[in-house]
A protein has these predicted regions:
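Glycine-rich adenosyl-nucleotide cofactor-binding module
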Residues: 1-18
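Short, charged low-complexity linear segments at domain edges
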Residues: 1-5, 33-52, 103-107
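Iron-sulfur cluster-binding cysteine motifs and their immediate structural context
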Residues: 15-39, 59-83, 142
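C-terminal amphipathic alpha-helical segment
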Residues: 52-84, 101, 105-116, 122-129
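Conserved nucleotide- and phosphate/pyrophosphate-binding catalytic cores
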Residues: 84-96, 116, 129, 138
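Amphipathic alpha-helical scaffolding segments comprising HEAT/armadillo-like alpha-solenoid repeats
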Residues: 105-109, 136-148, 167-179, 201-205
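Short inter-helical turns and helix N-cap capping residues of alpha-solenoid HEAT/ARM repeat scaffolds
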Residues: 120, 150-152, 182-183
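Structural detector for internal amphipathic alpha-helices that build alpha-solenoid repeat scaffolds
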Residues: 124-135, 145, 155-167, 187-200
Length: 205
């Protein structure tokens, strides 16, 4: 087993602590995994807490902010190993297209990829949050598709995403979903999303 790493080279630097969107780095070299975007998007299998969703931005699988801001990492040479290189399609994936993936398409698209760890429902849950954080009406078709997915986890987070878009069309989609949805958690998310419209200072209704 590896020996515990005890050497401290951080000095007075707090860049990683300051940059973390969810304030997951709670003390010197201590991370609260329950707040870490990498944990939330990969390891957490259930619903992501609502208060953390806006802080996740467009991260859909992991997060490297703390690594990117670390001065020491800036001195590390780039790896020439091809296996570590990301495909162009993985750098800026089309979130709408990801929401269209069925189970077999998901497994084919991410074959031999660590993305399989989060499973389809986990990835599309994350995509729904990213689309909601985008807040653009162009996200509505993908979120509407997510709202009728067979997985309650995807439906519930798609409802939240529609609440963030806050247009009349999004509102109508959520209201219509109330008449057909039966899952208690999804219904709760739909009602919360509808109430979010009323809290906005200038909802587009």
């Amino acid at each position: 087993a590896d020996q515990p790493f005890t050497r401290v080279d951080c000095g007075t630097c707090t860049r990683c602590i300051d940059a973390c969107p969810t304030e997951a780095i709670v003390a010197d070299r201590e991370v609260d995994s329950r707040l870490c975007i990498s944990y939330l998007t990969i390891e957490l299998k259930g619903s992501i807490p609502r208060n953390l969703r806006p802080k996740m931005g467009n991260w859909i699988f992991g997060c490297d902010i703390c690594q990117e801001v670390c001065p020491w990492n800036g001195k590390a040479p780039l790896s020439m190993e091809k296996g570590f290189a990301a495909e162009d399609s993985a750098r800026t994936p089309d979130l709408g297209k990801l929401m269209e993936l069925n189970q077999s398409e998901f497994r084919k698209r991410f074959k031999n990829s660590p993305v399989l760890r989060t499973k389809r429902r986990g990835l599309l849950r994350n995509v729904a949050i990213a689309l909601g954080n985008w807040g653009n009406p162009q996200a509505i078709p993908a979120l509407e598709l997510g709202l009728i997915d067979q997985e309650p986890l995807i439906r519930s987070h798609s409802a939240w995403g529609l609440g963030q878009v806050a247009t009349k069309k999004a509102y109508d989609i959520l209201e219509n979903a109330l008449t057909s949805e039966e899952d208690p958690q999804v219904l709760e998310e739909i009602r919360e999303a509808l109430s979010a419209f009323k809290e906005k200072t200038d909802p587009i209704l």
